């Protein structure tokens, strides 16, 4: 009987898989928000045009947005075990959100902040 050997290349271990998991999730979340071909509903990633004007202080609209965004993100990012979406600011042409999450296989909470300005999303550092 003849044996064949198959060579495989294993990914390099950085020694800190948690860090790479966190970086990967943040990178993929930012891609979900900023990609023109995002699977997220356009209403959730377009900075909520309804707020451009008189609705930015509408608490029901803000609550609806947070629930819809949370549901969509949990559907598209299976590495998130728990997620809370918070609106930090909602102005006419600016929207700031904070995603507070727990990842599977990670014991520390992860915060990911985004701001919608000038027609696109920008990542900010948590305070």
UniProtKB/Swiss-Prot annotation:
Keywords: Cytoplasm, Stress response. GO terms for cellular component: cytoplasm. InterPro entries: Anti-adapt_IraD (IPR023776), IraD/Gp25-like (IPR007048). Pfam families: GPW_gp25. It comes from the Bacteria. SUPFAM superfamilies: gpW/gp25-like. Signal peptide: none annotated. Its main location: cytoplasm. It is found in: Cytoplasm. GO terms for biological process: cellular response to oxidative stress; DNA damage response. Interacts with RssB. Inhibits RpoS proteolysis by regulating RssB activity, thereby increasing the stability of the sigma stress factor RpoS during oxidative stress. Its effect on RpoS stability is due to its interaction with RssB, which probably blocks the interaction of RssB with RpoS, and the consequent delivery of the RssB-RpoS complex to the ClpXP protein degradation pathway. Belongs to the GpW/Gp25 family. IraD subfamily. NCBIfam families: PRK14128.1-1, PRK14128.1-3. HAMAP family: IraD. This is Anti-adapter protein IraD. The lineage of its organism: Bacteria, Pseudomonadati, Pseudomonadota, Gammaproteobacteria, Enterobacterales. The gene is iraD.
């Amino acid at each position: 009987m003849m044996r064949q050997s198959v060579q495989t290349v294993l990914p390099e271990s950085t020694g800190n898989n948690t860090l790479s998991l966190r970086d990967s999730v943040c990178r993929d979340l930012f891609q979900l928000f900023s990609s023109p071909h995002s699977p997220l509903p356009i209403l959730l990633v377009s900075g909520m045009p309804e707020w451009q004007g008189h609705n930015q202080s509408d608490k029901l609209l803000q609550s609806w947005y947070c629930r819809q965004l949370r549901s969509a993100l949990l559907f598209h990012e299976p590495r998130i075990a728990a997620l809370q979406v918070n609106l930090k600011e909602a102005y006419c042409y600016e929207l700031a959100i904070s995603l507070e999450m727990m990842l599977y296989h990670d014991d520390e909470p992860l915060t990911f902040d985004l701001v919608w300005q000038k027609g696109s999303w920008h990542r900010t550092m948590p305070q």
